[in-house]
Amino acid sequence: MELAILMLTVGSAVVEIKCGSIYRLEEAYTIFLNGEERGTTQKVVTSLFNLSPDRDYLLQLAGEDGSIRGEISFHTKTETAVLNVRDFGEQDDTVFIQAAIMACPPEGRVVIPPGKYRVTSLFLKSNSNLELEEGAVLIYDGRPGRLPILPGLLSGKEENSFALGSWEGEAADMYAALFTGCGAENVNLYGKGEILGGASMEDWWSEENRQSSPHRPRMLFLTHCKHIRVQGLHFSMCPSWCIHPCFCSDLGIYDVEIINPEDSPNTDGINPESCEDVEIAGCHFSLGDDCIAIKSGKGRRAQENPVPG
């Protein structure tokens, strides 16, 4: 059995078990890390969490008969600092989480420990790791009056116009996502935490709000970003598209779960738009629309920025 490492951070890894299956394995395997049992898996793409930074690991998978079927060695990344968001305040979840993100030194790690956090919009910072520990729940406070708006086009010389907000392939004003990345690079967003969009037919999914401008927010929106990795998170009740990278390159999305009601409108799972080098593996979808929709823009935006989609 061949194993491959798809993603590495300071405290996690994603391993692919290459055995001919697509999502679920025919049998369960016991996971051993440096000889210590770490549970079982029956998924082709499996996440490993609670690893130590800058450490050598030997991963071994044992079959039901106890024999080792495959193994691979890897070394976790080095980190410069660990920032617990609870050290940055107690009154406004959005502000103290954002403060921790902005204060994080290059290659540091921001940790969101178990608990419930009500947030509006958080903005990602380059060269950082953001971990949602198991039991951490981010609840999107999506009241329009509290959300930042991303303009469709930033003002400036027409030949140097910069599209920020987006809707259905064209530059358009939109509400900022729970996680927004603008020109961010080298970011890992991972963990076993949950992200609840809180949408319903009474608000974001209503006929009125489906067509209104600014347009509905995503859960993770990335524009002009590079070298981004997303792992292990659980998303649900998204106002519209869940993960929407736009004009991004070198993006990996692994072992995430996206759950929305079957009658929820336009709640696509992952929609890469005008992106390059995108890898999506081991994800689970149960949605009201497309699981994955590859887009390339349209109209003036597609003509001025002819990036393959």
Please describe what each predicted stretch is:
Residues M1-G309:
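Extracellular/periplasmic carbohydrate-active domains that bind, remodel
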